[in-house]
Amino acid sequence: MLKAGNACVELFEYQSPEPKRRESMRPVCDHGITHLCLQVTDIGAEYKRLEAAGMTFHCSPKRVGSDILATYGRDPDGNVVELLEVPAESPLAVVAS
């Protein structure tokens, strides 16, 4: 369970029955969850860790505005995952509990 403020996200990975594979490069405009953003405190370390675990990134982390870093990639199942590093003092920061 991922918690941030008053919101939570619970992620499942089914082993049985064996899930059917879907198109791994399906467009993000298709129905269903197509994009998950995770706020991290060290985007460089998470980028390297996830890349080693099989995630394919579209690009290395890039600066957005003056103080935010972001990158997008696809996990081994084709899900689009965004990594976002926002300084704690930024009004956009979400503090996980």
Which sequence ranges carry the predicted segments?
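Vicinal oxygen chelate
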Residues: 1-37, 47-74, 87-97
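Conserved SAM-binding loop
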Residues: 83-85
